[in-house]
């Protein structure tokens, strides 16, 4: 109580508080955290299950990450933890050996795990015994360090192939002071066997065995790290704070911030604190506004509005006069008939196609006789275009149509008999009139042959034409030209009429004055005889060929019969054989014996 009453004591305490506050900016923050440190000498043997029951997806998603976590949390070095790794499936494969590449380097182990992820796919069975024997051989060869702790960690998802041999090898390793731990992952793990294998009872805790699903694979590593590592508490310095920033406001309450460089993940890099610079001055209050009173202005009385006079009713409208009916329109005059179109000139008749030669018949069928060409129909004489067709008068609108008079000629009805062409008097025809079946000269020939443009025939002198001394092949109208080959129709194209059918089924010619009828020539008898000779020659050839083929068939049948008789006689001399009924097929047993050995008759050769 005396100290509390002494003023000097309070003064000293006040000075100490002020000094601490002023020097607080220089004090560094400290954070305490725990970390596992593995400083003991341990030879760790990792046995990795690579059987096909794991599957490629679990291998990539769970096994490789679990193995990577185990390597990253160990203090791997030459003097502390050394690693050996064995992959087992159907056979054991040593990936890392003690005192070799990857045994004391964490970076080398990461490279080996990456190669295992990219180049290996789980396959085969679970041969755990071969992997345990590999560890036993290393200890027997003294590849391990004598003062280091020997620990075997097995990563598996199933039951080993041979339970008895695996248990025997594990017991041998335990006698050599080797600790065995198992991590069982997946649904196919035999928990009872794994507990016995690591030396635990059926019930109770087992620190050297852990099992779970694939998602818990990485968390199950931590209990095994405690076997080789210990947790150490450490202190981390977070660094020096920077100066506080200015207050966010110029008056009243605000905030200030200071920052620093982060040296540890658990350290904060920014801090905020409240601040107050000064009180803000009060805002001046505006004086109240006094309203000015305005004198009231008297309101004038409003005069009442007089009612409006009622509007006079409108006069009724007069009814509209009915419209006068329109006069009937005069009937329109009938349209005048159009002038008839002039008839078009008749087209030239097309030349008839040449009759095709009969094709030679193919062997062996007999050639069919070619049909005789049909005679072309005689063309009807064209209508004289000089007589125009008269148009029919239009019907009168008032009266009905009058019946046609049968005695009056209708221009639209074509007569049955052709109309004779009209020849102007005194006109010379383009071609002379040729006599049909007489040798008499026509009466309309000119007196002198030189007055005509066409050459006329003259009587022959001893079979020679006296008018054709220069050119014996001169074209004379009445001269007969014999055909040069067997075709009787060659050269007759100009002599056969060429009809051309129009839309009204009548035939027209370019020359209206040519009334001569042309008839096609009939094939000569020589042509028919030559054709029959050719047919007889072809028929004789077929008969000869048929005879030869028939003879060859007869010779072949005789040879077959001879071979059959000779074979049957040889079989009879060879001894008793199986019954003929047993040799024959079931469908051939019903045939009569006489029909089986019947020789062809005389009529069969034909």
UniProtKB/Swiss-Prot annotation:
Ranges where the VWFA domain occurs: 43-228
* Transmembrane stretches, start-end: 544-564
Does the keyword Transmembrane belong to this entry?
Answer: yes
Signal sequence segment: 1-24
Its domain of life reads Eukaryota
Q: Does this UniProt record's set of keywords contain rRNA processing?
A: no
Q: Describe the disruption phenotype.
A: Decreased sporozoite capacity to invade mosquito salivary glands. Decreased sporozoite capacity to infect host liver. Decreased sporozoite gliding motility in vitro. No significant effects on merozoite invasion and development of erythrocytic stages of the parasite. No significant effects on the levels of mature gametocytes and the ability of male gametocytes to exflagellate. No significant effects on sporozoite formation. Dispensable for sporozoite adhesion to human hepatoma HepG2 cells.
Q: Note the effect listed for residue 244 to A.
A: Decreases sporozoite capacity to invade mosquito salivary glands. No significant effects on sporozoite capacity to infect host liver. No significant effects on the numbers of midgut sporozoites
Q: Report keywords, A-Z.
A: Cell membrane, Cytoplasm, Membrane, Signal, Transmembrane, Transmembrane helix
Q: Where is the composition biased (Low complexity)?
A: 409-425, 440-450, 459-479
Assembly with partners or alone: Interacts (via integrin-like A-domain) with Anopheles gambiae saglin/SG1F; the interaction probably promotes sporozoite invasion of salivary gland. Interacts (via integrin-like A-domain) with human AHSG; the interaction promotes sporozoite invasion of hepatocytes and formation of exoerythrocytic forms of parasites in human hepatoma HepG2 cells.
The role this protein plays is: Promotes parasite ability to invade host hepatocytes. Promotes parasite ability to invade mosquito salivary glands. Required for sporozoite gliding motility.
Tell me the protein's name: Thrombospondin-related anonymous protein
Its lineage reads:
Eukaryota, Sar, Alveolata, Apicomplexa, Aconoidasida
The gene behind this protein is TRAP
């Amino acid at each position: 109580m005396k100290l509390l009453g002494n003023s000097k004591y309070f003064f000293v305490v006040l000075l100490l508080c002020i000094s601490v506050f002023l020097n607080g900016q220089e004090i560094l923050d400290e954070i305490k955290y725990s970390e596992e440190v593995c400083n003991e000498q341990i030879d760790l043997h990792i046995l990795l299950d690579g059987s096909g029951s794991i599957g490629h997806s679990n291998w990539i998603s769970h096994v490789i990450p679990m193995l990577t976590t185990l390597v990253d949390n160990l203090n791997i070095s030459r003097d502390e933890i050394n690693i050996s790794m064995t992959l087992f499936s159907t056979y054991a494969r040593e990936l890392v050996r003690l005192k070799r590449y990857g045994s004391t380097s964490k970076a080398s182990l990461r490279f080996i795990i990456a190669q295992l992820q990219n180049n290996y796919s789980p396959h085969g069975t679970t041969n755990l015994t071969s992997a345990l024997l590999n560890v036993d051989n290393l200890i027997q060869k003294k590849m391990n360090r004598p003062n280091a702790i020997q620990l075997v960690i097995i990563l598996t998802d199933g039951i080993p192939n041979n339970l008895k041999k695996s248990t025997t090898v594990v017991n041998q390793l335990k006698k050599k002071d080797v600790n065995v731990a198992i991590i069982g992952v997946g649904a196919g793990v035999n928990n009872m066997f794994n507990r016995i294998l690591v030396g635990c009872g059926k019930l109770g805790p087992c620190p050297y065995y852990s099992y779970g699903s694939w998602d818990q694979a990485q968390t199950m590593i931590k209990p095994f790290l405690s076997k080789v590592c210990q947790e150490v508490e450490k202190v981390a310095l977070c660094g020096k704070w920077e100066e506080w920033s200015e207050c966010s406001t110029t008056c009243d309450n605000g905030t200030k911030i200071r920052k620093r460089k982060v040296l540890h993940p658990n350290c904060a890099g920014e801090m905020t604190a409240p601040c107050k610079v000064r009180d803000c001055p009060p805002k001046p209050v505006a004086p109240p506004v006094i309203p000015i009173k305005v004198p009231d202005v008297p309101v004038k009385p409003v005069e009442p509005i007089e009612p409006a006079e009622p509007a006079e009713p409108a006069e009724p409208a007069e009814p509209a006069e009915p419209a006068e009916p329109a006069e009937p329109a005069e009937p329109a005059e009938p349209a005048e008939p159009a002038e008839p179109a002039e008839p078009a000139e008749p087209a030239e008749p097309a030349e008839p196609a040449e009759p095709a030669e009969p094709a030679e018949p193919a062997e062996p069928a007999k050639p069919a006789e070619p049909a005789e060409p049909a005679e072309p129909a005689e063309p009807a004489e064209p209508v004289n275009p000089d007589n125009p067709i008269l148009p029919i008068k239009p019907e009168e609108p008032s009266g009905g149509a009058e019946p046609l008079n049968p005695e009056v000629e209708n221009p639209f009805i074509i007569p049955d008999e052709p109309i004779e062409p009209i020849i102007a008097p005194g006109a010379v025809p383009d071609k002379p009139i040729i006599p049909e079946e007489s040798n008499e000269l026509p009466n309309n020939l000119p007196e002198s042959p030189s007055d005509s443009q066409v050459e006329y025939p003259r009587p022959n002198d001893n079979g020679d034409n006296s008018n054709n001394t220069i050119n014996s092949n001169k074209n004379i109208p009445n001269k007969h030209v014999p055909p040069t080959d067997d075709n009787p129709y060659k050269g007759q194209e100009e002599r056969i009429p060429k009809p051309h059918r129009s839309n009204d089924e009548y035939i027209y010619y370019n020359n209206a004055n040519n009334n001569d009828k042309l008839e096609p020539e009939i094939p000569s008898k020589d042509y028919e005889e030559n054709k029959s000779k050719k047919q007889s020659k072809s028929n004789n050839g077929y008969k000869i060929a048929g005879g030869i083929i028939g003879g060859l068939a007869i010779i072949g049948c005789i040879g077959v019969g001879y071979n059959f008789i000779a074979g049957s006689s040889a079989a009879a001399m060879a001894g008793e054989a199986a019954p003929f009924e047993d040799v024959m097929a079931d469908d051939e047993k019903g045939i009569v014996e006489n029909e089986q050995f019947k020789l062809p008759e005389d009529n069969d050769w034909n």
